[in-house]
Design a protein with these regions (language model features):
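Short, basic, glycine/proline-bearing loop/turn elements
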Residues: 21, 82-88, 103, 177-185, ...
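Structural motif
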Residues: 22, 51, 210-212, 257-259
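Active-site-proximal region of nucleotide-activated glycan assembly enzymes
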Residues: 131-217
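Conserved hydrophobic helix-helix packing surfaces used for dimerization/oligomerization
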Residues: 16-17, 207, 253
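Glycosyltransferase specificity loop/lid
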Residues: 2-143, 147-160, 282-313, 317-331, ...
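Short, solvent-exposed loop/turn segments at secondary-structure junctions
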Residues: 55, 117-118, 137-139, 213-215, ...
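Donor-nucleotide binding loops and adjacent catalytic segments primarily
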Residues: 13, 36, 214-316
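Short, well-ordered alpha-helix to beta-strand connector turns
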Residues: 43, 62, 108, 204-205, ...
Length: 413
């Protein structure tokens, strides 16, 4: 009887789950791919929608794909660096129009979004249940402090005075960044979410935190807010030809600026490591022309590397401080050196530093000497390795994909 019931469900009433990634960074696309894979295609029709800029990293593509427009990653990074509103009303209106067309075409039973803020309008307008994947440090319920980002005024006034000013103006800045979505919700007859960027980032029927409470604690969470645990992803790319040749007798360091790191990060890391007794394996993630990089004999570079494989062969990871890379490192028990250049990365690395599993450096004030010192500290101080291994032990108890499957099943019952 159970077998007959399952067959009938698969043929006649298979639910459609639509995943929408805001591809301003690779992490948002990657997390949607991981969660899409977590579902059984025999039980669900799975559709992924994204700007196609990262599609080449997931070939052959395993699901139905719908192309949508996303602002360029360079525009996103520049707005963050200048403290400007990232998604203005005009951009969000364009997104909502695209969303509505997409939802009408796919007809999903559930839409899962990663940083697609316009779904806070398009999903309720079409009465489609909406689950948002977001980091817990953006939750209004997170028990955290907010470091001042690297903004033009902090480069002039310094961090101490800049932090005091940021503490005073942050609520007003968060309200300013929340205004476009609230304006557009009113225009569509929906109530405003509130004058707080954190509420805008986390509004959904179901809010799913791609974090663990041991790293990013929250208090008094609403019943529709859930910790998933880390959502990890790696490029579906082949290992480079040099993979079997690089020396493994010295400490191995993996470095990648990611899609949102600064363009000069990898060249500076290479310069810092050129004279050290280490081996560097690196992925430019498209941020540098690898053919033009000066690579000493202890440096091996490719455009992309499977991050899971690279990290599990390394004693240290150097990255932009984003959660996708740091969770992969901590899962493997590897300490992190994070070069942060926006508030998202700083909030994530603040948590990593709090548990002594890594060191954060602001990219706007980094010398080669500082990079060398941080690398030596992380490689030669046992407390960082012990803390990273402790984090790995905690993370081993989490299964974000299973938790997601269970939540989807409850939503679609």
């Amino acid at each position: 009887m159970l077998s007959d019931k399952k067959t009938e469900t698969n043929i006649g009433t298979k639910k459609t789950v639509l995943f929408i990634a805001e591809a301003v960074t690779l992490a948002h696309f990657g997390r949607m791919m991981t969660l899409a894979r977590a579902l059984d295609p025999a039980q669900y029709r799975i559709v992924v929608a994204s700007d196609p800029r990262y599609l080449h990293l997931e070939q052959p593509f395993p699901f139905e794909f719908e192309s949508i427009w996303t602002i360029p990653g360079s525009q996103f990074s520049q707005s963050l660096a200048q403290g400007k509103v990232v998604f203005d009303t005009k951009t969000l209106a364009h997104y909502v129009e695209d969303d509505l067309q997409l939802l009408a075409t796919v007809k999903p039973d559930l839409v899962v979004g990663d940083f697609r803020l316009s779904l806070a309008i398009s999903a309720p307008l079409t009465a489609v249940p909406y689950a948002s994947v977001v980091n817990a440090y953006w939750s209004p319920f997170a028990k955290i402090t907010y470091p001042v980002p690297d903004l033009p005024f902090t480069r002039i006034l310094g961090l101490t005075l800049g932090q005091k000013i940021f503490n005073a103006v942050r609520p007003f800045a968060f309200a300013l960044h929340a205004r476009p979505l609230n304006t557009l919700r009113r225009r569509h007859g929906l109530a405003p979410i509130g004058n707080d960027l954190r509420k805008v980032y986390t509004w959904a029927d179901h809010t799913l935190y791609a974090d663990i409470p041991e790293l990013i604690p929250c208090e008094k969470l609403p019943v529709n807010h859930h910790y998933l645990g880390p959502v990890q992803w790696s490029t579906n790319t082949a290992l480079p030809t040099w993979w079997d040749q690089f020396p493994r007798g010295k400490p191995i360091i993996f470095a990648s600026p990611g899609s949102s790191g600064q363009d000069d990060l990898l060249p500076r890391v290479i310069e810092a490591l050129s004279g050290l007794p280490v081996t560097l394996i690196a992925a430019s993630a498209g941020r540098s022309d690898t053919s033009k990089l000066e690579t000493p004999s202890n440096v091996f570079v490719s455009d992309y590397l499977p991050i899971k494989t690279a990290i599990r062969n390394s004693q240290l990871i150097i990255c932009n401080g984003g959660s996708l890379s740091t969770y992969e490192a901590l899962t493997a028990g590897v300490p992190v050196l994070g070069f942060t250049n926006n508030l998202d990365q700083q909030l994530n690395m603040q948590a990593v530093e709090r548990i002594n599993a890594g060191i954060a450096i602001r990219t706007g004030s980094t010398s080669i000497a500082q990079i060398k010192q941080a690398i030596n500290t992380l490689l030669n101080t046992t407390r960082y390795q012990a803390a990273a291994q402790g984090a790995a032990d905690v993370l081993s108890h989490y299964d974000g994909e299973k938790t997601f499957r269970d939540i989807v099943q409850k939503i679609l019952l």
